UniProtKB/Swiss-Prot annotation:
Keyword Nucleotide-binding attached: yes
Family to which this protein belongs: Belongs to the DNA mismatch repair MutS family.
Listed name of the protein: DNA mismatch repair protein MutS
Function, as annotated: This protein is involved in the repair of mismatches in DNA. It is possible that it carries out the mismatch recognition step. This protein has a weak ATPase activity.
Keyword DNA-binding: yes
Naturally occurring in which organism (per UniProt): Bordetella bronchiseptica (strain ATCC BAA-588 / NCTC 13252 / RB50) (Alcaligenes bronchisepticus)
Length: 876
C-alpha cells in the first residue's frame, strides 16, 4: 500500500498512514477503543485470512476505504491464526489520554509479532520451542555459515558455525519458526518456516559486534567463547537487532550466548530424524513417537527439555554419565529408615512435588519483557511457596553430583516470594485493565479509592428511601448500568409525580429514567474514584514489574533446574515401569546390546521378541536378510534408538547394553518420491546413500535398508554390493545393512569384519509364521509370495506367481535385464541373447521331463548309473 498522506485525509487517517508506513508489509492492528482496526489492503487481506466482515469507513480520493476489525479481548486467538499462516503483525496501541487529546489520541507501535518472536502463552506450543534464527555466510574461497538462534520465550541464545553444505541439516536440527537473512543472500535450501529479509548492513561485522557488546554491556566477546566465530557473530548481531525491534525494548532476559562446537552432539540429519520418528511419525502425527512415549514430564519446561535431549544426543561420556547417575539415584535412593520398596514412593513424591510448578521459564521471560499476566504472577507466587517441599524431597538424592547441583540452583531470594505474596491478589483478574490485581493492604491510597468506589451501597439505599417518601412513588428504584451510569427509574404511570429537579436520562417503553443533582454529584465522585483506582493499580503493577526485573536471572536458573529434574524423573519413572537398564558407556566405537527392544513398538503390541546386536572392531557390518514383514526395519531402528537413548543419558530397553562414542547416526530406510523436487524414489535413495558415503566415519552408526531396489536387478545388486563394500572397507562405519539380494551374503567370506544375520520365519500348514528373531547366518528364503497371500492378493495371482517362481528358480539366475549403467546393445546382440535364453530354457525343460520320467524304485543299480550319465550329457 502506498497512500499519499495529505490534507484530503482526516487527522486520524493521516496518523494511521504514518504508522502503516512504519510497519511496512506487516499487518497493522490499529487500536480504536475496544477494537483493533485495519484499513485498505490490510483490511482486505485480514478479511480473507480471518474470515472477517469487510466494511467501509470514509473516503480516499472519492473511493470508500475498506475496513475490518477484531475485538481487543479476542486479539490473541486471531494472532494465533495469522502466525500459523506465516503472517507477521504490528500492534499499535493508544498511549495517550483520549480525554486530554485535542486531535487524534497518541498511538504508537508497541510490539511486532512474527512466527519466531512469540512470547504470549496463548500463542506458543507448551511442549515445543519456537526459535528465531539468523544465518550469515561469509568468505568466498573458504565460505563459512554462521548460525544464531534465540528462543525469545526463554532467553536461550545460541550460535554455531558450519560449512554451507551443512546449513540445511543444522536448521532442521534447530527447527526455527522464522529465519532472518540478508536481502541479497541467496540460500538454496529447503526450509519450511517463515523467511524474513533485512538490510545487508545488519550483518556487517562491526555493527553486529557493536550490537552484542552494547546488549551484554561488555567490552569484549571473549567471555562468550565466540571470538573465533566471525560468521556466527554477524548472524547473532543481526538477530538481536531484529528481536529487540519486534519487542520495542531491550531483551533483559537474554543474558548470555552459548557457543556450540563441532563434536558436541551426535549428528542426526533430517532423514534420520524423520526415519527414527523422534518427535513426529512418518505420517506427520505427534504420536506414537519416542518423545510421546517418554514424555511423562509434569511441567512444560521438562517436556521441552526432553524434546531437545532427544534431538541432541551427546558425544562426550561425562555429561551423559552425570544424567545417567542421577536417574539411577532416583531409582535406588530411599529416605532414612524406609523399606526397600520405598524407592518408587520417593520418585513419586518428587514427581508429585513437580506438579505444583507452572512454566517458570516463560514467565521469567515475560517478566523481563513486561508482558506477564497477573495470573501468571499468582502462579509464580504459589510455586515459590512449594519450593521448600521440593527441595526436601531431593535430600535423598545427594549421592548424585548432578542432583546436588540442581538442588542448589533451586534456591531463590526470599524477597521475591514475600513481594508477590504482599502485592498480588489471591485470585487476580485476567488482565490489569480489569482491576482487582493488586492485593488489599499493599497500597493505602489504592485501598481508599477502592472503598470510595465500592462502598456506596448505603448511600443508594438511603437515597432511594428518601426519594420514595418525597415523591410518593412507591416503586421508584435507584439503579446503575455501564452505559448510562446511575439513574432513578419511574414507571410511566407515575411520571406526573416527578419533581422539577429530576432530569430525564433515558426513555423506555414502560418507564422513564432520571438523574438528580445529588445523584449526579455522587456519581461523578464514584466514577472518578473507579478511574483513579484503576489508574493507580496500573501504575502499581508497572512498579511491581520493575521490582521483579532483578529476579529474572535467578528465576531462569530455577526454571532450568526444575526442567532437568522433571526430565530426569520422567526418564527414571519410565525405566522403572518398563524394566530399562543403564547402558555401559565406553570410549571406543562399539554397540553391544543383549535382548534389546524397540521402545515404541513394544508398547504397541502384546508380545515383543527381544534381539541382540553386536558391532565392534571385529564385526563392523551386519548383513540382514529375511522375509518381508519379518522385522528387519524394526530391528534396525531399534538398535539406532537404543544407541541414541544411551547418548542422551537415558536408560535403555534391553537386559544389557554397551554403547560407545558415536559421531553420527545415518539412516536410509523406506521409499518416497520427492515430486516437488523432481526426484524419483531411486534418485532419493542414491542421494541419501551418497551423503552417507561422503560423511560417515568409523565412529558412525549407519542403517541401510534395501538399497538398490529402485532400479533393475543387476544394477541394484551391483550398487548394493559396491556401497556395502565401501562402507565396510573405506568408511568402516558400524553398519546394519538389510537386503533382499542374497548374493550380498557372500561378502563376509571376503571381508571377515562383516557378518550375516537373518530374521527367522517358519512355514506351517496355515502359511508363514514370522518369528521376529535375529539369528546368525543368511536367510534361506524371502517368503515374498507368502507375504502377498497374507496381504489378501487373489489366489489366482498367488498360484501364477508360485509357478513363475518355480520356473525362475529352475533357471538358476534372474531374468537378464538392461541396467542403467549398461551400454546400449544393437539389435543383433539383443536377438542373440534372447535366442540363447530360449535354447537354455528348452534344454532345461527337456532335462526336467526326463527326470520326471525316471522311477528310482524300479531301476537296478546299473540302470540308475546309466540314467545319470545320460542326464549329465545334456548338461555338457
Amino acid at each position: 500500500m502506498s497512500q499519499v498522506i495529505d490534507s484530503k485525509h482526516t487527522p486520524m487517517m493521516q496518523q494511521y498512514l504514518r504508522l502503516k508506513a512504519e510497519a511496512g508489509p506487516l499487518l497493522l492492528f490499529y487500536r480504536m477503543g475496544d477494537f483493533y482496526e485495519m484499513f485498505y489492503e490490510d483490511a482486505e487481506r485480514a478479511a480473507r485470512l480471518l474470515n472477517l466482515t469487510l466494511t467501509k469507513r470514509g473516503n480516499s480520493n472519492g473511493t470508500p476505504i475498506p475496513m475490518a476489525g477484531i475485538p481487543v479481548h479476542a486479539m490473541e486467538q486471531y494472532l494465533a491464526r495469522l502466525v500459523a499462516l506465516g503472517e507477521s503483525v504490528a500492534i499499535c496501541e493508544q498511549i495517550g489520554d483520549p480525554a486530554a487529546a485535542k486531535g487524534p489520541v497518541e498511538r504508537r507501535i508497541v510490539r511486532i509479532v512474527t512466527p519466531g518472536t512469540l512470547t504470549d502463552e496463548a500463542l506458543l506450543p507448551a511442549k515445543a520451542d519456537r526459535a528465531l534464527a539468523a544465518v550469515c555466510v561469509t568468505g568466498k574461497r573458504e565460505p563459512r555459515a554462521g548460525l544464531a538462534w534465540l528462543n525469545l520465550a526463554s532467553g536461550a541464545f545460541h550460535v554455531t558455525e558450519c560449512a554451507p553444505g551443512q546449513l540445511e541439516s543444522e536448521l532442521h536440527r534447530i527447527a526455527p519458526a522464522e529465519l532472518i537473512q540478508a536481502e541479497s543472500a541467496e540460500l538454496h535450501m529447503a526450509f519450511e518456516g517463515a523467511r524474513t529479509r533485512v538490510p545487508d548492513w545488519h550483518f556487517e561485522a562491526d555493527g553486529a559486534r557493536a550490537q552484542l557488546l552494547a546488549h551484554f554491556k561488555t567490552d569484549s566477546l571473549g567471555g562468550f567463547d565466540v571470538e573465533d566465530m566471525p560468521a556466527a557473530v554477524c548472524a547473532a548481531g543481526a538477530l538481536l537487532r531484529y528481536a529487540a525491534r519486534t519487542q520495542s525494548q531491550a531483551l533483559a532476559h537474554v543474558q548470555t550466548i552459548a557457543a556450540e562446537r563441532p563434536g558436541q552432539y551426535v549428528l542426526l540429519d533430517p532423514v534420520t530424524r524423520r526415519n527414527l520418528e523422534l518427535t513426529q511419525t512418518l505420517s506427520g502425527e505427534e504420536s506414537p513417537t519416542l518423545f510421546s512415549l517418554l514424555d511423562g514430564c509434569r511441567t512444560p519446561m521438562g517436556s521441552r527439555l526432553l524434546r531437545r535431549w532427544l534431538h541432541h544426543p551427546l558425544r562426550e561420556n561425562e555429561p551423559v554419565l552425570a544424567r545417567q547417575h542421577a536417574i539411577a539415584t532416583m531409582l535406588t535412593a530411599r529416605q532414612e529408615g524406609e523399606q526397600a520398596f520405598a524407592a518408587a514412593a520417593l520418585l513419586e513424591t518428587l514427581r508429585d512435588a513437580l506438579n505444583a510448578f507452572p512454566d517458570i521459564e516463560r514467565i521469567a521471560a515475560r517478566v523481563a519483557l513486561r508482558s506477564v499476566r497477573p495470573r501468571e504472577l499468582a502462579s509464580l507466587r504459589d510455586a515459590l511457596v512449594a519450593l521448600p517441599a521440593l527441595h526436601a524431597s531431593l535430600a535423598p538424592l545427594s549421592g548424585s553430583p548432578r542432583a546436588r547441583e540442581l538442588a542448589a540452583q533451586l534456591a531463590m531470594p526470599p524477597d521475591i516470594g514475600e513481594l508477590l505474596a504482599r502485592a498480588v491478589a489471591s485470585e487476580p483478574a485476567v488482565a490489569i485493565r480489569d482491576g482487582g490485581v493488586i492485593a488489599a493492604g499493599f497500597d493505602s491510597e489504592l485501598d481508599e479509592l477502592r472503598a470510595l468506589a465500592t462502598d456506596g451501597g448505603d448511600f443508594l439505599v438511603q437515597l432511594e428511601a428518601r426519594e420514595r417518601e418525597r415523591t410518593g412513588i412507591g416503586n421508584l428504584r435507584v439503579e446503575f448500568n455501564r452505559v448510562h451510569g446511575f439513574y432513578i427509574e419511574v414507571s410511566k404511570g407515575q411520571t406526573d409525580k416527578v419533581p422539577e429537579d429530576y432530569r430525564r436520562r433515558q426513555t423506555l417503553k414502560n418507564a422513564e429514567r432520571y438523574i438528580t443533582p445529588e445523584l449526579k454529584t455522587w456519581e461523578d465522585r464514584v466514577l472518578s474514584a473507579q478511574d483513579r483506582s484503576l489508574a493507580r493499580e496500573k501504575w502499581l503493577y508497572e512498579q511491581l514489574l520493575d521490582a521483579l526485573a532483578q529476579y529474572v536471572r535467578p528465576l531462569s536458573q530455577c526454571a532450568s533446574a526444575l526442567a532437568e529434574l522433571d526430565t530426569l524423573a520422567a526418564l527414571a519413572e519410565h525405566a522403572r515401569r518398563h524394566d530399562w537398564v543403564a547402558p555401559e558407556l565406553i570410549d571406543g566405537a562399539e554397540i553391544d546390546i543383549e535382548a534389546g527392544r524397540h521402545p515404541v513398538v513394544e508398547r504397541a503390541i502384546e508380545r515383543f521378541t527381544p534381539n541382540g546386536c553386536r558391532l565392534d572392531q571385529t564385526r563392523r557390518m551386519l548383513l540382514i536378510t529375511g522375509p518381508n514383514m519379518g522385522g528387519k526395519s524394526t530391528y534396525m531402528r531399534q538398535v539406532a534408538l537404543i544407541a541414541l537413548l544411551a547418548r542422551t543419558g537415558s536408560f535403555v530397553p534391553a537386559t544389557r547394553a554397551r554403547v560407545g562414542r558415536l559421531d553420527r547416526i545415518f539412516t536410509r530406510i523406506g521409499a518416497a518420491d520427492d515430486l516437488a523436487g523432481g526426484r524419483s524414489t531411486f534418485m532419493m535413495e542414491m542421494t541419501e546413500a551418497a551423503a552417507i558415503l561422503a560423511a560417515s566415519t568409523p565412529a558412525s552408526l549407519v542403517l541401510m535398508d534395501e538399497i538398490g531396489r529402485g532400479t533393475s536387478t543387476y544394477d541394484g545388486l551391483a550398487l548394493a554390493w559396491a556401497i556395502a563394500y565401501r562402507l565396510l572397507t573405506h568408511n568402516r562405519a558400524l553398519t546394519l545393512f538389510a537386503t533382499h539380494y542374497f548374493e550380498l551374503t557372500r561378502l563376509p567370506a571376503e571381508q571377515p569384519t562383516a557378518a550375516n544375520v537373518h530374521l527367522a520365519a517358519a512355514e506351517s500348514a496355515g502359511g508363514i509364521v514370522f518369528l521376529h528373531e535375529v539369528r546368525e547366518g543368511p536367510a534361506s528364503r524371502s517368503y515374498g509370495i507368502q507375504v502377498a497371500q497374507r496381504a489378501g492378493v487373489p489366489a489366482a495371482v498367488i498360484r501364477q506367481a508360485s509357478r513363475e517362481l518355480e520356473r525362475l528358480e529352475a533357471q538358476g539366475a534372474p531374468t537378464p535385464q538392461l541396467g542403467l549403467f549398461a551400454a546400449a546393445l544393437d539389435a543383433d546382440v539383443q536377438s542373440q541373447a534372447m535366442t540363447e535364453q530360449a535354447e537354455d530354457a528348452a534344454a532345461l525343460a527337456q532335462l526336467r521331463d526326463q527326470l520326471a520320467a525316471i522311477d528310482p524304485d524300479s531301476l537296478t543299480p546299473r540302470e540308475a548309473l546309466d540314467a545319470l550319465y545320460r542326464l549329465k550329457q545334456h548338461l555338457t
